[in-house]
Amino acid sequence: MSAPSRAEDAPRIAAIDRAMEQQIEQHEIAGAVTLVATQNSILHLSAVGEADIANHKPMKTDSLFWIASMTKPITATAIMMLEEQGKLSVDDPVSKYIPQLAHLKTQDGVEHVVTLKHLLTHSSGMAEASSAEAHSSKNLEQLIAHYTERPLLFAPGSKWQYCQAGINTLGRVIEIVSGQSYPDFLQQHLFTPLGMKDTTFYPTQEQADRLAVSYKRAGDQLEPAPIAMFGGAPLTSHDRYPAPNGGLFSTAPDYCRFCQMIINEGTLNGHQYLKRETVEKMTSIQSGDLKSGFTPGNGWGLGWCIVREPQGITAMLSPGTHGHGGAYGTQAWIDSKADRIYILMVQRADFPNSDASPTRLAFQQAATH
């Protein structure tokens, strides 16, 4: 990836900066980092607004963000790496690796087989753990134990329903199959070789000092909103499980490296992470005709939302564009047909639908015109 030598020297697209400044003026966000890239270069990288309003801290291009569910495609990538190594198949029943999940039943008492593919496509029917159960779990093994206690919500494969439990279970499968902890596997096989030095479940103090504050609306202003997922624990604390469904922190340039590996069909800077056919499988619709995603016209791949019929918030994207959002408004979308990657980093806790936020719409419209 050809990156600017210094962030402040990065190329900028004025229309994107103006669009984000307008979002700040309308109190939608405090600040934003935006990035537009191709397969091998950055076309735009910019920070506008503030990372911390009270302390007048400007947003910077290396500001750290809780990327929440943008963790999910990374978890899926790790699963596909293990499939390529011959250590698992996405068609395997999850019970092959976690025997406690062997006899899952729907409410009517019928037993069903849940496969890894069901987990990757949010079609497993697995029920969630409670917030209290999640916060009390110190590792993935403890967390997954809670999933065995509940009936399936529907027959696997019959419906799409966004499922944190399924993705978290995949994280535990990664540990069992690889013999490494989930964070160690990601660090060794993705973050270190890709140069994603600021992508972590457990920020250092230096990284935490760069974290953009999360905000929610209070009338026509913004007020701080702590990250609920972590239950008030210090972000630097290791006393929590590394959440495969949404525990990562990252920066726009870091996440771009991951996206460039995907848009380059599994290879970046001469290092092959995945085979081309594996990336094609991940980023093509695997959910059939099931109504999928949080905005109209989408399907689901293996860990990725896929734009089936561009419309509304996706109208400016090509069919087949794939990406994922995060709970606090972060977004990353890969339009392979146009050779474009679009990354938006913001921290807004109360967007009614972060995938359909006015900030995402403004960014994508400015970035594609």
How would you describe each model-predicted region?
Residues 22-35, 54-118, 154-165, 243-246:
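Short active-site loop at a secondary-structure junction
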Residues 328-341:
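Short, surface-exposed beta-strand/loop micro-motifs that present aromatic residues
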Residues 50-52, 105-319:
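Short, surface-exposed loop or secondary-structure junction motifs
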Residues 8-65, 103-104, 141, 145, ...:
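Short, conserved catalytic-motif segment at the N-terminal edge
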Residues 13, 17, 21, 33, ...:
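Extracytoplasmic/secreted envelope proteins and their assembly/folding machinery
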